[in-house]
UniProtKB/Swiss-Prot annotation:
Expression by tissue: Specifically expressed in maturation-stage ameloblasts.
Main location: secreted
Composition-biased stretches (Polar residues): 33-43
Protein source organism: Mus musculus (Mouse)
Similarity section: Belongs to the amelotin family.
Keyword rRNA-binding part of the UniProt annotation: no
Localization annotation: Secreted
Protein name: Amelotin
Record region (Disordered): 22-43, 162-213
Length: 213
């Protein structure tokens, strides 16, 4: 009984194995000799990955489609297309000639490159704006600005406003005194025996009072 079961198992396993057919003769191939090398059958890509033909990779893998967004001035004419092969698929890769890679690194105290593990927790970033002195719109330093023309005509405090008006009309070494105003300005009356003061160019003189006879 055991031998019958064993024979049936061997027979079933022999029938389940695929048979190799010789395309020239059309008969099943015999066992190869020890010196003969059996050629391996070539498998098609669709047999290994049958689902790759169902995925539209040409629409998903569009390399360089976002590069014109960074440089719209170049347009489609400024981009160079390079063909590449991705298995059974073909596509085009767009490269901008004026785009260069940017490498950002942080230097240590001795000028050595630091890895991400050696970087300090609180990174310090220094920003600034450099303006050329001859660039239009640049602000010169305070020491080189020179005297402004508005300083001479500037507004002075109340106590110095009168002194400025007097100093503009004076010359060094000559000081003039304001003339004596009339008595009406001071609300004073001249006595009967005195004369009013007479105005002169060099000052004021007062005549002696007339003696009554």
């Amino acid at each position: 009984m055991k031998t019958m079961i064993l024979l049936l198992c061997l027979l079933g396993s022999a029938q389940s194995l695929p048979k190799q057919l010789n395309p020239a003769s059309g008969v099943p191939a015999t066992k190869p000799t020890p010196g003969q090398v059996t050629p391996l059958p070539q498998q098609q890509p669709n047999q290994v990955f049958p689902s790759i033909s169902l995925i539209p990779l040409t629409q998903l893998l569009t390399l360089g489609s976002d590069l014109p967004l960074f440089n719209p001035a170049a347009g489609p004419h400024g981009a160079h297309t390079l063909p590449f092969t991705l298995g059974p698929l073909n596509g085009q890769q767009q490269l901008q000639p004026q785009m260069l890679p940017i490498i950002v690194a942080q230097l240590g105290a001795q000028g050595a490159l630091l890895s991400s593990e050696e970087l300090p927790l609180a990174s310090q970033i220094f920003t600034g704006l450099l303006i050329h002195p001859l660039f239009p719109g640049a602000i010169p330093p305070s020491g080189q600005a020179g005297t402004k023309p508005d300083v001479q005509n500037g507004v002075l405090p109340t106590r110095q406003a009168g002194a400025k008006a007097v100093n503009q009309g004076t010359t060094p070494g000559h000081v003039t005194t304001p003339g004596v105003t009339d008595d009406d300005d001071y609300e004073m009356s001249t006595p009967a025996g005195l004369r009013r003061a007479t105005h002169t160019t060099e000052g004021t003189t007062i005549d002696p009072p007339n003696r009554t006879q």
